[in-house]
Amino acid sequence: MAYKHIGVAISGNEEDALLVNKALELARHNDAHLTLIHIDDGLSELYPGIYFPATEDILQLLKNKSDNKLYKLTKNIQWPKTKLRIERGEMPETLLEIMQKEQCDLLVCGHHHSFINRLMPAYRGMINKMSADLLIVPFIDK
């Protein structure tokens, strides 16, 4: 199958390189657009009852550091049809919205082989709603 626009769900971790390399190989083979998608789910909302005066500054610093890693990753990709989307929202809804807006026909995402992921994989909520193909790349936990 020929893909025209490949979306890659990235988290800002080292594993992103594996996902990007897989997607880049497919993009080159299909002469497809490549969109790296990062969903910022808002760490500050995890503990709504707790607030420290420096919380916003710390969260902004963490976000800037994470965003810089993502920009650097995108800049190092040797493919002219590459872009980065960083959106604030919840998984999987925001990811599905971006996939639809970008008209992606393939989503590349990763999966850790852990006990909790076997019980509740993050992609479970996407499968029945996704109109694009889904490539799940296993991460080997060390």
From Swiss-Prot:
Keywords for the protein's UniProt record, in alphabetical order: Cytoplasm
Entry keyword annotation includes rRNA processing: no
Any GO BP annotation: response to UV
Superkingdom as given in the UniProt entry: Bacteria
Predominant location: cytoplasm
SUPFAM superfamilies cross-referenced by the UniProt entry: Adenine nucleotide alpha hydrolases-like
Record's note on what induces expression: During growth inhibition caused by the exhaustion of any of a variety of nutrients (carbon, nitrogen, phosphate, sulfate, required amino acid) or by the presence of a variety of toxic agents. Positively regulated by guanosine 3',5'-bisphosphate (ppGpp) and by a RecA/FtsK-dependent regulatory pathway.
Gene3D superfamilies tied to this protein: HUPs
GO function term, MF aspect, one: protein homodimerization activity
Keyword Lipoprotein: no
CDD domains xref list: USP-A-like (cd23657)
A cellular-component GO term for this protein: cytosol
Subcellular location: Cytoplasm
Assigned protein family: Belongs to the universal stress protein A family.
NCBIfam families cross-referenced by the UniProt entry: PRK09982.1 (NF007436)
Stated role: Required for resistance to DNA-damaging agents.
Protein's UniProt name: Universal stress protein D
